């Protein structure tokens, strides 16, 4: 559960970062 949650969080975090980066850039 912890590993799966970490993977999901990493994917979501990467998506948010790339979206924020695109918007900022």
Swiss-Prot record:
Return the protein name.
Alpha-lytic protease
This protein's UniProt keywords: Hydrolase, Protease, Serine protease, Zymogen
Q: Which reaction does it catalyse?
A: Preferential cleavage: Ala-|-Xaa, Val-|-Xaa in bacterial cell walls, elastin and other proteins
Question: Broadest EC class?
Answer: hydrolase
Family designation: Belongs to the peptidase S1 family.
A GO molecular function annotation here is:
serine-type peptidase activity
Q: Does the keyword Lyase apply?
A: no
Biological-process GO terms, alphabetical: proteolysis
Q: Where is the signal peptide?
A: none
InterPro entries per UniProt: Peptidase_S1_PA_chymotrypsin
- Is Transcription found in the keyword set? no
Q: Which organism does this sequence originate in?
A: Achromobacter lyticus
* Protein EC: 3.4.21.12
